[in-house]
Amino acid sequence: MQTAARRSFDYDMPLIQTPTSACQIRQAWAKVADTPDHETAGRLKDEIKVLLKRKNAVLVAHYYVDPLIQDLALETGGCVGDSLEMARFGAEHEAGTLVVAGVRFMGESAKILCPEKTVLMPDLEAECSLDLGCPEEAFSAFCDQHPDRTVAVYANTSAAVKARADWVVTSSVALEIVSYLKSRGEKLIWGPDRHLGDYIRRETGADMLLWQGSCIVHNEFKGQELAALKAEHPDAVVLVHPESPQSVIELGDVVGSTSKLLKAAVSRPEKKFIVATDLGILHEMQKQAPDKEFIAAPTAGNGGSCKSCAFCPWMAMNSLGGIKHALTGGRNEILLDRKLGEAAKLPLQRMLDFAAGLKRGDVFNGMGPA
């Protein structure tokens, strides 16, 4: 067994995952609708507002979706947040129908936590490269090879993979949960994001076996180009999501979830920020800190057709038209087998309970509830 100090590109598992193919990515981009003109967008938003009230529905959106959808969610009493905030909001809201604007695992998580609610999505084909790269059968076989290890999986996974896990985590609470498990002497299997897993392993010193998944957006950030950009803007604060490669994370002044990066952008006194995450977050950053400058971190070097192409094609598949379509006749509903949902809820609820304890400021054994 190699130690936590080993080089970040040495991982513990053979390449047995199903990688996200260029064909899948092209297919996703092909389904992205054109941005509607101002008049059409206004009409669609008005129609959706009526439908949300009529259906006793609430719109729950991720920071990475179209700004039009983010604004609509807030205008109608919904939520814009990271995956942890979305899950918590959906579980606590009284609406009988949740419209989840994000990627499929987010809709599944909402259904797992609220099986009695109707969960709709603008497009059921809005996937996630981490989910696609971690098929349940292969991941379960990997876990079976290490029965003495606690299985912790990122929220960016299918309901079937969650059901195989002991813990589900998001980037908002991953360090705290792994620190807690380490304090209990537990050894871990981590999946699917190898960069986030390696970052957590280096930060906590936990004994972790890593699955080799990655996010197609964050995996493209380039450390060398980011260093050059940072040299051009020495007064800028570098904000990095931990799904990025180690060479990028090491340049970060703040490393964390989308919510943590947003909070840093708003609360820190500096006026310039380089942002290494999906560019969808820039909308909320600019809204909350209009006096500050935000620079997209580079995803390509010299000769690249796009210096920063940090957009998730599946997030981009969410559209106002898709939301209207979902609400008209209840289309695009997330359906889960009852037993599968119950099994997946245990590790997911464990994370939410843990996060609630952190928020309350409970006394912890190590970093988690005793």
UniProtKB/Swiss-Prot annotation:
<dbReference type="GO" id="GO:0008987">
    <property type="term" value="F:quinolinate synthetase A activity"/>
</dbReference>
<feature type="binding site">
    <location>
        <position position="258"/>
    </location>
    <ligand>
        <name>iminosuccinate</name>
    </ligand>
</feature>
<feature type="binding site">
    <location>
        <begin position="154"/>
        <end position="156"/>
    </location>
    <ligand>
        <name>iminosuccinate</name>
    </ligand>
</feature>
<comment type="similarity">
    <text>Belongs to the quinolinate synthase family. Type 1 subfamily.</text>
</comment>
<dbReference type="GO" id="GO:0034628">
    <property type="term" value="P:'de novo' NAD biosynthetic process from L-aspartate"/>
</dbReference>
<dbReference type="GO" id="GO:0046872">
    <property type="term" value="F:metal ion binding"/>
</dbReference>
<keyword id="KW-0411">Iron-sulfur</keyword>
<dbReference type="InterPro" id="IPR003473">
    <property type="entry name" value="NadA"/>
</dbReference>
<dbReference type="InterPro" id="IPR036094">
    <property type="entry name" value="NadA_sf"/>
</dbReference>
<keyword id="KW-0408">Iron</keyword>
<feature type="binding site">
    <location>
        <begin position="241"/>
        <end position="243"/>
    </location>
    <ligand>
        <name>iminosuccinate</name>
    </ligand>
</feature>
<protein>
    <recommendedName>
        <fullName>Quinolinate synthase</fullName>
        <ecNumber>2.5.1.72</ecNumber>
    </recommendedName>
</protein>
<keyword id="KW-0808">Transferase</keyword>
<dbReference type="Pfam" id="PF02445">
    <property type="entry name" value="NadA"/>
</dbReference>
<dbReference type="GO" id="GO:0005829">
    <property type="term" value="C:cytosol"/>
</dbReference>
<comment type="function">
    <text>Catalyzes the condensation of iminoaspartate with dihydroxyacetone phosphate to form quinolinate.</text>
</comment>
<feature type="binding site">
    <location>
        <position position="83"/>
    </location>
    <ligand>
        <name>iminosuccinate</name>
    </ligand>
</feature>
<feature type="binding site">
    <location>
        <position position="171"/>
    </location>
    <ligand>
        <name>iminosuccinate</name>
    </ligand>
</feature>
<feature type="binding site">
    <location>
        <position position="128"/>
    </location>
    <ligand>
        <name>[4Fe-4S] cluster</name>
    </ligand>
</feature>
<feature type="binding site">
    <location>
        <position position="62"/>
    </location>
    <ligand>
        <name>iminosuccinate</name>
    </ligand>
</feature>
<comment type="pathway">
    <text>Cofactor biosynthesis; NAD(+) biosynthesis; quinolinate from iminoaspartate: step 1/1.</text>
</comment>
<dbReference type="GO" id="GO:0051539">
    <property type="term" value="F:4 iron, 4 sulfur cluster binding"/>
</dbReference>
<keyword id="KW-0004">4Fe-4S</keyword>
<dbReference type="InterPro" id="IPR023513">
    <property type="entry name" value="Quinolinate_synth_A_type1"/>
</dbReference>
<feature type="binding site">
    <location>
        <position position="312"/>
    </location>
    <ligand>
        <name>[4Fe-4S] cluster</name>
    </ligand>
</feature>
<keyword id="KW-0479">Metal-binding</keyword>
<keyword id="KW-0662">Pyridine nucleotide biosynthesis</keyword>
<keyword id="KW-0963">Cytoplasm</keyword>
<feature type="binding site">
    <location>
        <position position="215"/>
    </location>
    <ligand>
        <name>[4Fe-4S] cluster</name>
    </ligand>
</feature>
